[in-house]
């Protein structure tokens, strides 16, 4: 439900262990029951354009399996992701140490997502989106596992129809457990946030001024940041 205002990190309930925004060869199957339950399986491959082939022992690939329940005002889902031969889409939003060895043998990831929204827009209550990810590595030089999270709030139709206020915060994938011999490495807690207001001057234009920032973003040094951006979308 949360719609990001500036940062890719807050897409998909957190751009993290199981999901990615890059493109690759893939296929998927979805079954949705009338009672709100749904399940899906997707397969992605990066070897289709090379010599590795698709879904071979050498293919850089990922298989996601998701179970979800959606009602009018809330949603719950869990996704299991099996990744092999250096699948590294997760490393885009990870700390320096966690992403330092993206050519891992394999990884098992779990992504938990939930959202709730009020019955009507224009309420003082925001919609709430939560995401938590954990990933375990086989063959990583530094990490046994890592985790990250996000929380996103949206208020709609607050000052005028079709406007949106957004506020989100979260952490990139950061190492929880180091491999033997790398335990002396200490990561600082990373944190990233954004705030924005989106409105429509008319039916064809949407304007979104946003500010964003973070502390210890890469977790290996005090690398804080702060910035702002104005996005204007035209539809004809």
Which positions does each model-derived feature cover?
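Surface-exposed coil loops of outer-membrane beta-barrel proteins
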Residues: 1-63, 94-98, 177-179
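Outer-membrane beta-barrel domain signature
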Residues: 13-19, 50-56, 89-90, 98-103, ...
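Residues that define the transmembrane beta-barrel architecture of outer-membrane proteins
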Residues: 21-25, 59-63, 106-110, 143-149, ...
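Residues on the lipid-exposed face of transmembrane beta-strands in outer-membrane beta-barrel proteins
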Residues: 27-31, 65-69, 78, 112-116, ...
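Repeated loop/turn-to-beta-strand initiation elements of outer-membrane beta-barrel proteins
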Residues: 35-41, 63, 69-78, 84-89, ...
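Transmembrane beta-strands of outer-membrane beta-barrel pores
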Residues: 43-47, 71-73, 80-86, 132-138, ...
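Long, well-ordered mid-to-C-terminal structural blocks that present hydrophobic/aromatic surfaces
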Residues: 70-157
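Predominantly the C-terminal beta-signal and adjacent terminal strand-loop region
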Residues: 191-236
């Amino acid at each position: 439900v949360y719609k990001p205002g500036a940062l890719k990190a807050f897409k998909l309930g957190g751009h993290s262990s199981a999901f990615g925004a890059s493109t690759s060869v893939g296929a998927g199957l979805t079954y949705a029951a009338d009672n709100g339950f749904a399940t899906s399986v997707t397969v992605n491959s990066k070897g289709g354009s090379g010599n590795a082939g698709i879904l071979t022992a050498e293919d850089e690939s990922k298989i996601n399996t998701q179970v979800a329940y959606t009602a009018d005002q809330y949603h719950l889902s869990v996704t299991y992701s099996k990744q092999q031969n250096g699948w590294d889409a997760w490393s885009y939003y990870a700390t320096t140490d966690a992403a330092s060895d993206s050519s891992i043998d394999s990884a098992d990831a779990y992504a938990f997502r939930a959202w709730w929204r009020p019955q009507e827009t224009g309420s003082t209550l925001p919609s709430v989106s939560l995401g938590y990810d954990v990933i375990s590595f086989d063959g990583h030089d530094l990490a046994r596992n890592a985790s990250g999270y996000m929380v996103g709030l949206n208020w709609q139709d607050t000052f005028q129809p079709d406007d949106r206020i957004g506020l989100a915060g979260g952490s990139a994938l950061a190492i929880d457990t180091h491999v033997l011999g790398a335990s002396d490495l200490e990561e600082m807690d990373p944190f990233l946030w954004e705030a924005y207001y989106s409105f429509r001057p008319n039916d064809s234009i949407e304007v979104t001024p946003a500010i964003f920032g973070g502390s210890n973003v890469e977790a290996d040094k005090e690398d804080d940041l702060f910035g702002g951006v104005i996005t204007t979308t035209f539809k004809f």
